[in-house]
From Swiss-Prot:
It comes from Carsonella ruddii (strain PV). Residues 94-158 form the S4 RNA-binding domain. CDD domains: S4 (cd00165). One of its GO terms (cellular component) is small ribosomal subunit. This is Small ribosomal subunit protein uS4. One of the primary rRNA binding proteins, it binds directly to 16S rRNA where it nucleates assembly of the body of the 30S subunit. Belongs to the universal ribosomal protein uS4 family. The lineage of its organism: Bacteria, Pseudomonadati, Pseudomonadota, Gammaproteobacteria, Oceanospirillales.
Length: 197
């Protein structure tokens, strides 16, 4: 698993929002100001079309903790078929590391990857060590219960509002019901198509 040396709070400040690295309370405590990272905290100015495309791409990559090579590969896989912003988000939301995080079995996508790589996650009752594995509707996901004990104090209420997942949290069990059809970033279809022109 690759590591990022930059601090997560800098990513959030750069994008101007919480990228789910922190709880809202902790994010407000850490962010302190709306200034972007820099020597003197440069304020945001007018963004060009290219800058908007770049910021959109960076935000998606940071949100799902993926790197340029992997993102580019995903982009061209999706572009072979009819492509729109929902297709891209659906693809990323189907990743096993993301679903483990959505189930609140981990406090971050990075921790999800650790759980998966160390063999503590099962898909349809078979061990799966591939964080980028794409789930299909009806897939059953289970996790080694010993890793749930430290999660009881975590904000479990988030999962109650995710209608495309079924979760029995304290049994370490969940089902991927359907595709999310969520547009988390209000993406413009034409803007996304221009990323790798």
């Amino acid at each position: 698993m690759t590591k990022k040396k930059s601090k997560n709070i800098k990513f959030c400040r750069r994008e101007g929002e919480n990228l789910e690295f922190f709880s809202e309370k902790k994010y407000l405590e850490k962010s302190r100001s709306n200034l972007t990272p820099g020597e003197n905290g440069t304020e945001k100015g007018k963004v060009s079309d290219f800058g908007l495309i770049l910021r959109t791409k960076q935000k998606i990559k940071r949100y799902y903790c993926i790197f340029e090579k992997e993102f580019k590969k995903i982009y061209f896989i999706i572009k072979k078929n009819f492509f729109n912003n929902i297709d891209l988000i659906n693809f990323l939301e189907r990743r096993l590391d993301n679903v483990i995080y959505r189930f609140n079995f981990s406090i971050s996508r990075k921790e999800s990857r650790q759980l998966i790589i160390h063999g503590n996650v099962f898909v349809n009752y078979f061990k799966n060590k591939i964080p980028s594995y794409l789930l299909s509707p009806g897939d059953v996901i289970t996790i080694n219960k010993k890793f749930l004990l430290k999660k009881y104090l975590y904000d479990y209420k988030n999962i109650l509002f995710v209608n495309w997942l079924y979760n029995k949290y304290f049994d370490g069990y969940g089902i991927f019901l359907s595709f999310s059809n969520k547009n988390l970033f209000n993406l413009n279809k034409n803007l996304i198509l221009d990323i790798y022109k």
